[in-house]
Amino acid sequence: MSQGILSPPAGLLSDEEVVVSPMFESTAADLGSVIRKDLLSDCSVISTSLEDKQVPSEDGTEKVKVYLRVRPLLPSELERQEDQGCVCIENMETLALQAPKDSFAQKSNERGIGQATHRFTFSQIFGPEVGQASFFNLTVKEMVKDVLKGQNWLIYTYGVTNSGKTYTIQGTIKDGGILPRSLALIFNSLQGQLHPTPNLKPLFSNEVMWLDSKQIRQEELKKLALLNGGLQEEELSTSLKKSVYIDSRMGTSTSFDSGIAGLSSSSQFPSSSQLDEMSHRWAQPDTVPVSVPADLRFSIWISFFEIYNELLYDLLEPPSQQRKRQTLRLCEDQNGNPYVKDLNWIHVQDAEEAWKLLKVGRKNQSFASTHLNQNSSRSHSIFSIRILHLQGEGDIIPKISELSLCDLAGSERCKDQKSGERLKEAGNINTSLHTLGRCIAALRQNQQNRSKQNLVPFRDSKLTRVFQGFFTGRGRSCMIVNVNPCASTYDETLHVAKFSAIASQLVHAPPVQLGFPSIHSFLKEHSLRASPSLETGAKTDPGLGDDIENEVDISTYGKEELLQVVEAMKALLLKERQEKLRLEVQLRDEICNEMVEQMQQREQWCSEHLDTQKELLEELYEDKLTILKESLTSFYQEELQERDEKIKELEALLQEARQQQVAHQPSGSELSLRRSQRLTSVSTQQFHEIKAKLEQCKAELNSTTEELQKYQKMLEPPPSAKPFIVDVDKKLEEGQKNIRLLRTELQKLGESLQSAERACCHNTGAGKLRQALATCDDILIKQDQTLAELQNNMTLVKLDLRKKAACIAEQYHTVLKLQGQASTKKRLGANQENQQPNQQPPGKKPFLRNLLPRTPTCQSSTDCSPYARILRSRRSPLLKSGPFGKKY
């Protein structure tokens, strides 16, 4: 028989057949009444009759089962004082977690964050005293019964490392877990009803493939190669009976105790006592009643794979010489259901074969030693059991039911794994578990808020993609939470409890009727619309409609009836089109309104953004201008300083040149004449320069005198300040006398220079010329001394003026307080402003501004009071006296 993928026939389901598709309400999104495009292809392989559906609760929904199991403490843990009462079972459904003193939750509670006690509700809680058999009978047994009736179930364990997950799934040789007990229950319940030959093999997610005799032989050899622990397929050329005999003598033995005392996995042959115990275990008469037709047969196939570091590996891969394992791909079929490509499905005839294949897969699984478990599984392992329901001779497409048991890897802190592969494994495990939590949270959010459906991130992890079919309607799921009561793992246990609390709030949607209306329903509806009299007949004979609806033969209808059906369908189609058009118009209006609102919001945001950018740019450029001003000020100050230094250097060079000229005087009358002429010209030039400076000094003195006179006129102090004014006037008169003396001395200096010039013209002797120059130098020195004395006198006058101005301001302030006149308030403000510069030292601006290089300063036009002018005059620095004659 050629290999081929079976597709469902066209008339497999009747018009009124009810298709039960249990799924989370959150994923359904109120689309239960919408007819799917390819309904028959979706429901032909996996379908459930009306009698197989579960009874919903009172509100029409059924919550996801979440069971919790607490493992007992080990003697070593009791010695480490791990029993601090942090896990307390209050009743069969409520668990209380009390934070121990060294936990992070307790420290957060002491800082006022969070709480120390948390309570969680589960479907049922099992304490440490509950055995494997009791746990299986109270939880998984009903699910196995549903699988035998045609439903799909996913059972997965969740918990921290070393919490008993693997023990719950697989158990030990003496006390099996839910997986071996499920296998035993399935095979014990289906005794005598198993299909003898594996001519149908599961393919993709919910399809089957026909196998010919050669392919059946290859499947048997593959299974024997796995059961015999590494023999090549070429060596298995003996008959099936002999192979089965060899299979009964050889095998592997594995003790799974990962959750209690660390997983101890050994690939060795079982002893005779162990074989007897296993045979006795499979012979237990634990069955469930299965009411099936007499010609119905079952074919059971199993697969076993793991997800390690986000890579898929087949654990039932035949042995080969290659050291590197082949990775598998996760694909989707034409209906969008995920499946593992090239995954090995092994046909099993009894529970013993399935148990041995499980041990072979466990031998290939990834294990490693961690700080919590000496032999911890570092991957998510998924063991799937598919049951093909074969009707008759197997020519009809079978119905497929599946039971998947997933042993999730334990969540663990990455900081406990310092580096290397363990750190990478822990990171991938935590990432996949976190993605699973996000998917469950999104499903719960969609369930609570049906108007706003969020995207469920199934594709963010390989684990969630494998679970996607069970979360979106292809089956049901159940969570078993394993809790470690140790105080050192309380924070991780609290996180696990919070995760399971979200999962416990998910619900399954009730069965939804999917199918097309029958022809008779159209006929009945059209008849009622055509003749109202038929409505009475329909009411009087309700059984007639039921009999008509049960008929499925279209050939019994006449042409007129079929035309009526066509007319009714046209009317229904027109009505649906009008409804869809109305919905389209409504949606377009809503979308346009939303777009307009979004554009307005966008425009407002852009304007606000531009204003903000404008303010930021203004501040930025103001700062840049300030920095530029400071840099220019510092630059020009440095330039002025360099100029002063150059002037000093030139003066020093000039002094050295004069000394050298005096030391090396040439002999002869010509040299002396030339030298005298040169000195005369230099003296004449200096005389003109001094004369110009003298004129500038006169102008400056005149302006200063005028300013002092203005100050005297503007200052009209009270009578109490007259003694101070008299003293100031005396000192000013003395200063003016000194100025007059200075002027007379300057005139004498000019006359002496003129006489020296005339003497130089008549007397060519070098000695007389030197005497004239010495006389000029003496006169210049005296002039410098006079100027210095005058400057000191002016300084004293300024100090007295400061004191008197302060006294005048205080007296004015006192008078204004006493009189309270409004006309003097402005003058009081000016006095207060003029008092502030008294705190600053006077500036270094020279009094005789024309003698030194200076930059023009801007006078303040805001304050022109006499007090402000007096204060501005204080800022002029003291004039440094220097030898004018030596400079030139």
Swiss-Prot record:
Residues 823-863 are annotated as: Disordered. Residues 761-888 are annotated as: Globular. The modification Phosphothreonine is found at residue 855. The keyword Cytoplasm applies. Phosphorylated by PLK1 at Ser-527 during mitosis, creating a docking site for PLK1 and recruiting PLK1 at central spindle. The modification N-acetylserine is found at residue 2. It is found in: Golgi apparatus; Cytoplasm, Cytoskeleton, Spindle. SMART domains: KISc (SM00129). ATP binds at residues 159-166. The modification Phosphoserine is found at residues 7, 14, 21, 527, 531, 667, 683, 823, 865, 876, 881. Transmembrane segments: none annotated. Keywords: Acetylation, ATP-binding, Coiled coil, Cytoplasm, Cytoskeleton, Golgi apparatus, Microtubule, Motor protein, Nucleotide-binding, Phosphoprotein, Protein transport, Transport. One of its GO terms (molecular function) is ATP hydrolysis activity. GO terms for cellular component: cytoplasm; Golgi apparatus; kinesin complex; microtubule; midbody; nucleus; spindle. InterPro entries: KIF11-like, Kinesin_motor_CS, Kinesin_motor_dom, Kinesin_motor_dom_sf, P-loop_NTPase. Residues 559-587, 630-760 form a coiled coil. Mitotic kinesin required for chromosome passenger complex (CPC)-mediated cytokinesis. Following phosphorylation by PLK1, involved in recruitment of PLK1 to the central spindle. Interacts with guanosine triphosphate (GTP)-bound forms of RAB6A and RAB6B. May act as a motor required for the retrograde RAB6 regulated transport of Golgi membranes and associated vesicles along microtubules. Has a microtubule plus end-directed motility. Belongs to the TRAFAC class myosin-kinesin ATPase superfamily. Kinesin family. This is Kinesin-like protein KIF20A. It comes from Bos taurus (Bovine). The lineage of its organism: Eukaryota, Metazoa, Chordata, Craniata, Vertebrata.
